[in-house]
Regions:
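Residues within the DNA-recognition helix of helix-turn-helix
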Residues: 47
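N-terminal helix-turn-helix DNA-binding core of bacterial DNA-binding proteins
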Residues: 2-43, 54-56, 61-63
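Alpha-helical DNA-recognition elements
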Residues: 50
Length: 63
């Protein structure tokens, strides 16, 4: 039940929905998402952490 609640809370935010929509088209790094959504990289990072905590996205560092 708490896992479902976490997912629903993550999906309740418009910005996070926009991020998920953009990522459904292709993988993107934070800076590109920020540019595309006209947000700061810090804002995108904040929301990505929430999406990761809910298990909705994975992240990786490019080398």
């Amino acid at each position: 039940m708490s896992e479902t609640l976490g997912i629903l809370k993550a999906l309740a935010d418009d910005t996070r929905l926009k991020i998920l929509r953009a990522l459904s088209e292709r993988d993107m790094y934070v800076e590109l998402l920020a540019e595309r959504l006209q947000l700061s990289a810090a804002t995108v990072s904040f929301h990505m952490k929430k999406l990761q905590a809910a298990g909705l996205v994975d992240s990786r560092r490019e080398q």
